[in-house]
Regions:
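Acidic-and-aromatic substrate-binding clefts and catalytic sites of carbohydrate-active enzymes
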Residues: 88-94, 117-128, 152-155, 161-168, ...
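Hydrophobic faces of well-ordered beta-strands that scaffold small-molecule active sites
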Residues: 35-39, 111-113, 143-146, 186-188, ...
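Active-site gating/metal-coordination segments in enzymes
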Residues: 25-26, 110, 118-227, 231-234, ...
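Catalytic pocket-lining loop regions of alpha/beta-barrel enzymes
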Residues: 201-343
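Mid-to-C-terminal alpha-helical segments outside catalytic/metal-binding sites
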Residues: 25-37, 42, 46-55, 60-110, ...
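Bacterial N-terminal signal peptides
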Residues: 8-17
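Sec/Tat signal peptide C-region and signal peptidase I cleavage site
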Residues: 18-23
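Bacterial N-terminal signal peptides that target proteins for export
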Residues: 1-7
């Protein structure tokens, strides 16, 4: 063998070995490492306590882009919120420590943390910047989601008929700021958020709102998904009695969400929209046949599943039985669309030094127990691979 042939042989062998390393890395990035795409940190609210009091005392200068009617509505809501209990200070990085411990218990490698959907002046409201210390502390584990404290209030406070160029420009500027901050998803946004207790919040804005359309365009442009909280309602209906009893904020009737939601999905097919809390149904229409119909019709729709504790076993359209095994009708749906389902436990992780002390994470526990009961291939896809692709992790 000539020296030249020996050299070629050595180089070829090296490339084969290197290729094997690359292949092994690509196989192991998500092996055993799941992803939760929807988590919150309890205790962040305290960071805003002093600032919130100042903001609540501001007038229309707080949001100069808003039309007069919207500012008046916001002022009325501000007065209501001022009467509600303020949240004591807490430490969100301590809650992040607790979240990491929760994740380690189930082999969850990464979690997306984001503010819940908010309205301006709500007690406990906070911006995405309050999460940056936690994300910085765990850069390989915690991923930033943003918009619930900035974009969602703009949508909720602006009547669709009052949207103008000034509002559109302000919304776009804030969305671009969020993208540049490193966020991997716009969230948590809401089209219909029912109030579940006196300290909860009712929020509703049609999914075909001009600002939702703009958000879809921006999501497509910057290649990041939208995280959406919404009840499934095909036609206008009276509010269920249990919701009226749970919270006085819920109106006597609820407007249909699904027709407008489909218009949002059709508006920009390049916008990935992840419908959160599938398995947490407060109306009764979030059924497997409906999900199948929508997934088949809209290729840019994705679902994030959430399990519920046994104490809430009467909840409608759960995805699992009392042993946290996926029900046959839901398993059939998952097997039909294995690349369109992710996991979002929707838990508020709370450390011991945060208001109220340590909080047992029931939704996180039961959601990931349910994932563990999936068939292996489906578990791998739904538990992590889909999220890595959809959220560009």
């Amino acid at each position: 063998m000539t020296l030249k042939k020996i050299f070629i042989f050595i180089v070829t062998l090296s490339l084969i070995n290197l290729k094997g390393v690359w292949a092994e890395e690509s196989k192991t990035v998500w092996a055993g490492g799941f992803v939760d795409v929807h988590m919150h940190l309890d205790g962040v609210q305290g960071k805003m306590t002093g600032q919130r009091q100042t903001n609540l005392q501001k007038k229309s200068s707080e949001a100069p882009w808003m039309p007069p009617k919207a500012r008046k509505r916001m002022a009325m809501q501000r007065q209501t919120m001022m009467r509600q209990q303020q949240t004591p200070a807490g430490d969100n990085t301590a809650s992040a420590d607790h979240l990491i411990a929760m994740m380690d218990q189930y082999g969850v490698r990464k979690a997306i943390v984001m503010p819940p959907p908010q309205t301006r002046g709500r007690p406990g409201a906070y911006p995405y910047t309050a999460l940056l210390d936690s994300v910085k502390k765990y850069p390989e584990r915690l991923i930033l989601g943003a918009g619930g404290g900035e974009l969602n209030p703009m949508i909720q406070e602006t009547n669709a008929s009052e949207v103008n160029e000034k509002i559109l420009d302000a919304f776009k500027a804030k969305a671009v700021e969020i993208v540049r901050s490193g966020a991997h998803v716009f969230g948590e946004m809401t089209a219909l958020h029912t109030c579940m207790n006196p300290k909860h919040l009712y929020e509703a804005s049609p999914p075909d709102h001009p600002l939702f359309f703009l958000l879809a365009d921006l999501a497509a442009q910057y290649d990041i998904p939208i995280d959406l909280h919404m009840e499934a309602i095909a036609e206008d209906l009276p509010t269920p009695e249990k919701l009226l009893q749970a919270c006085s904020q819920n109106p006597p009737a609820l407007s249909a969400t699904l027709p407008a939601f489909e218009r949002l999905l059709e508006h920009n097919r390049r916008a990935r929209i992840v419908w959160q809390h599938i398995g947490w149904d407060n109306i009764g229409q979030m059924t497997p046949p409906l999900m199948h119909q929508l997934l088949a019709k809209h290729p840019n729709l994705y679902l994030a599943i959430k399990a519920v504790p046994k104490a809430d076993a009467a909840r409608m359209n759960r995805i699992h039985d009392d042993n946290y095994t996926i029900l046959p009708e839901w398993l059939e749906l998952f097997e039909s669309f294995p690349d369109r389902i992710v996991v979002g436990a929707d838990e508020f992780a709370r450390a011991e030094n945060v208001r109220g002390g340590y909080k047992k994470p029931p939704f996180f526990d039961v959601t990931w127990q349910t994932v563990m009961n999936l068939p292996p291939k489906l578990q791998k896809q739904i538990g992590g691979e889909n999220a890595a692709r959809i959220y560009r992790l």
